[in-house]
Amino acid sequence: MERSLKKTKNNYNNSIKSNLMKDDELFHVIHKVPCGDTPYVRAKHAQLIEKNPEMAIVWFWKAINTGDRVDSALKDMAVVMKQLDRSEEAIEAIKSFRPRCSKNSQDSLDNVLIDLYKKCGRMEEQVELLKRKLRQIYQGEAFNGKPTKTARSHGKKFQVTVQQEISRLLGNLGWAYMQQAKYLSAEAVYRKAQMVEPDANKSCNLAMCLIKQGRFEEGRLVLDDVLEYRVLGADDCRTRQRAEELLSELESSLPRMRDAEMEDVLGNILDDDFVLGLEEMTSTSFKSKRLPIFEQISSFRNTLVC
């Protein structure tokens, strides 16, 4: 009888422990916090549970210095720093500590850097990084010769194709040129991006390039494609609202005819390096040893600047 009671008690205790373990696992799954008590785990707990970004950065630094999941710690710390308007510090951290990170993490760090450069208005560095990433894709380096790669957003994994990545990078490059008032370069990039994977947001940006150059009718045609649902993403409310605002801006600008001086403004000066690379890559014929998937995108090589 006593043995039976002891066995029942042990089973009860084991059941409680099992339930506690399940609850603990469920907690980490729900809050997307890793298990354990390492510096990186403490950093994620401070970031996601305690909502204390300053403390999270302290623990991220400890994780980096002790070699605890350095890839994730550096990237996550940079994201938190950006949220705290410490983007310049985040840029220097990535540049200083990325040599400690694995080769597979470099692409993710580049993407964080692109956002940080944009946040800080460091357009020249953003443009150079975007061009380098586009060259890597064309040369077959970025995807390890595969047609897709796995990306992560908000804790969820998804597949990204070569074409989607090219379109995304070209979109970012076009926007960077826009901030530099290099509207012809931006136009060329957006047109190539639309050839790879058309979407309504890039159509709006292309229309803005044309409006800035006084090419109102061309801009109207591009906006019509959005407002008539002829491009992907045209049903998005914010995109449609932006297209309508651009159309209003266009119509208000129509009475002001473009004069000869407009040809000399900074916005109509094409990036010389961009043109040179465009012409050289268009005129150059060569045989490639790359995988077929990269041969399929060879028609887009003139988006890259040598």
UniProtKB/Swiss-Prot annotation:
KW Coiled coil (keyword) present: yes
GO cellular component assignments: nucleus; transcription repressor complex
Induction of synthesis: Induced in response to sulfur deprivation.
Give the chief site where it resides. Answer: nucleus
Q: Where are the TPR repeats?
A: 1-22, 71-104, 107-140, 167-200, 202-233, 270-304
Q: Which UniProt keywords apply?
A: Coiled coil, Nucleus, Repeat, TPR repeat
Q: What does gene deletion cause?
A: Maintain higher tissue sulfate concentrations under sulfur-limiting conditions.
PANTHER family, A to Z: PROTEIN POLLENLESS 3-LIKE 2 (PTHR36326), PROTEIN SULFUR DEFICIENCY-INDUCED 1 (PTHR36326:SF14)
Q: What is this protein called?
A: Protein SULFUR DEFICIENCY-INDUCED 1
The organism named in the record is Arabidopsis thaliana
